[in-house]
């Protein structure tokens, strides 16, 4: 938790590892990952990145970060990112890690 003059800043991160069963090449995987990251960035205004498994055509580790003045709002935004991924993409979420920075 970081204190800034005039208010409180909360930074929360969500790191998920996904398995993309329908991917048969790095090109397939990157298409799916790029779509997930772009949609979450545009829809929920979060910072996003692919963090690991860059050269694996089936797995990817994705990171999402939001900055706000409300812990509940940060959790809500990250939950929406996770729900979007689970409901609109043919991927299996292998692990989920949340962190307050």
Per-range role (PLM):
Residues 1-8:
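N-terminal amphipathic/basic-hydrophobic helices that include classical n-h-c signal peptides
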Residues 11-12, 49-70, 99:
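Short, charge-patterned binding micro-sites
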Residues 12-22:
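Short glycine-/aliphatic-rich beta-strand segments at the starts of folded cytosolic domains
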Residues 20-24, 68-70:
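A generic structural motif
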Residues 29:
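C-terminal binding/interaction regions
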Residues 46-52, 92-95:
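A short linear hydrophobic-aromatic micro-motif
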Residues 66-101:
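C-terminal structural segments of small proteins and small subunits
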């Amino acid at each position: 938790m970081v204190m800034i003059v005039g208010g409180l800043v909360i930074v929360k991160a969500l790191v998920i590892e996904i398995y993309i069963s329908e991917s048969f090449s790095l090109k397939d995987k990157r298409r799916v990952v790029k779509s997930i990251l772009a949609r979450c960035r545009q829809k929920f205004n979060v910072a996003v990145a692919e963090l690991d498994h860059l050269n694996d055509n089936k797995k990817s580790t994705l990171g999402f970060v939001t900055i706000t003045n409300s812990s509940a709002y940060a959790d809500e935004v990250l939950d929406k990112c996770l729900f979007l991924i689970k409901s609109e993409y043919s991927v299996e979420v292998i692990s989920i890690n949340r962190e307050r920075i």
